[in-house]
């Protein structure tokens, strides 16, 4: 089945980035491929495909065979996808050469034979081919099956799971602009949620206000479900909103990412219905200094774990170490469900967090969040925990805080 490229003449909405942005990204990847000795790169992870082409879709199931092929020796790319996505692919100007499987259902048994045969027919299976064995995408057994087909055509297959992710860690000026827009939208949405809260309102209704505000500003669903937790649930982590109705005196924590063109900015704040107990306010005031310490002490060129050292030292200094569930963070960028984290974390640990090739450094374009999460089971009125999360954008001047919201506990009436 052929691309319906005539549909591109009917694109009447603004695309996220101009062609030259994608060309610059491909150039970076091709250079990294050459450095790694990879002749051909087959990408099945949607964040990487999106970053290189602008392709976007919502169903990356475990047998999915959507694949972008990148060559080290040429700017030519090749795209494979299912017949069901013919219109989607046809509306992506950066996809110029594609093989559309002419069968349904998606990911038929012969898809990988088609991919291997097509690549061999173009003389592209004689060298080293990189595949993505790690990360969200097709299951490892599916990638192994693809690897077997390529080996059968004479290719040497290597793991290149993070080759593209490592390139997209540091954002371009155009990407940084999108990140700033996502941050502003997130602040606006959190303020809308805060001012809408009132006793008797369910957590799901609070989320509805938050999501509606984000959508009205052009954002879409984030890669992780928004977290809203109130009262006795305020100390929960990674918990979706429930039908619980908020009450006077409750703490309400909201952890959300604004997702604009799939670029994520993470902000969390703890609010209160009425005035919060002074002990909660004291915890947040003492913890807030960890963010100030990052801004004051983290310098360009530092290893990323330096952020962790500085913030955790502040938490120890102000006596909150025993109450902290987690003080830490990770880089952010393009993400698709079910996760907005990647292989790189601030507290770098290769054994625990996957095949991260090296520690990152603080350089312009890096975007990362930082979390202060506290569990307190002392029977204080209002809840079982409080927290905040900030997102930083590193510029030529160092880490810049993106949110303008205070890190104290604002009430619904403030």
Indicate residue ranges for each PLM-predicted region.
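Active-site neighborhoods and metal-handling regions in enzymes and metal-associated proteins
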Residues: 1-414
């Amino acid at each position: 089945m052929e691309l319906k490229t005539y549909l591109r003449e009917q694109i009447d909405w603004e695309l996220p980035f101009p062609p030259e942005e994608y060309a610059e990204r491909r150039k970076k990847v091709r250079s990294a491929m050459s450095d790694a000795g990879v002749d051909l790169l087959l990408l099945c992870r949607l964040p990487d495909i999106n970053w290189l082409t602008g392709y976007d879709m919502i169903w990356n199931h475990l047998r999915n065979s959507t694949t972008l092929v990148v060559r080290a020796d040429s700017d030519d790319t090749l795209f494979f996808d299912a017949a069901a996505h013919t219109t989607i692919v046809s509306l992506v100007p950066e996809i110029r050469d594609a093989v559309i499987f002419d069968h349904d259902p998606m990911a038929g048994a012969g898809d990988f034979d088609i991919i291997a045969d097509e690549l061999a027919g173009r003389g592209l299976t004689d060298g080293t081919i990189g595949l993505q064995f790690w990360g969200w995408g097709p299951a490892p057994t599916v990638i192994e099956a693809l690897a077997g087909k390529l080996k059968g055509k004479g290719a040497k297959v290597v793991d290149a799971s993070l080759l593209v992710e490592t390139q997209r860690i540091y954002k371009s000026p155009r990407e940084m602009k999108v990140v700033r827009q996502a941050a502003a939208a997130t602040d606006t949405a959190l303020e809308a949620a805060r001012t809408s809260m009132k006793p008797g309102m369910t957590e799901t209704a609070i989320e509805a206000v938050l999501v509606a505000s984000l959508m009205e500003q052009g954002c879409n669903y984030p890669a992780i479900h928004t977290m809203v937790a109130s009262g006795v649930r305020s100390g929960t982590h990674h918990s979706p909103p429930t039908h619980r109705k908020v009450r006077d005196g409750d703490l309400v924590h909201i952890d959300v990412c604004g997702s604009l063109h799939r670029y994520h900015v993470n902000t969390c704040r703890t609010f209160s219905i009425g005035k919060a107990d002074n002990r909660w306010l004291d915890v947040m005031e003492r913890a807030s200094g960890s963010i100030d310490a990052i801004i004051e002490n983290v310098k360009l060129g530092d290893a990323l774990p330096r952020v962790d050292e500085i913030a955790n030292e502040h938490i120890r200094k102000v006596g909150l170490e025993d109450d902290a569930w987690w003080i830490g963070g990770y880089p952010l960028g393009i993400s698709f469900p079910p996760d907005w984290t990647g292989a790189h974390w601030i507290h770098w640990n290769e054994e625990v967090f996957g095949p991260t090739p090296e520690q990152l450094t603080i350089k312009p374009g890096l975007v990362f969040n930082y979390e202060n999460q506290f569990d307190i089971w002392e029977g204080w009125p209002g809840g079982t925990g409080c927290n905040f999360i900030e997102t930083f954008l590193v510029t030529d001047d160092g880490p810049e805080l993106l949110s303008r919201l205070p890190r104290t506990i604002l009430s619904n009436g403030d």
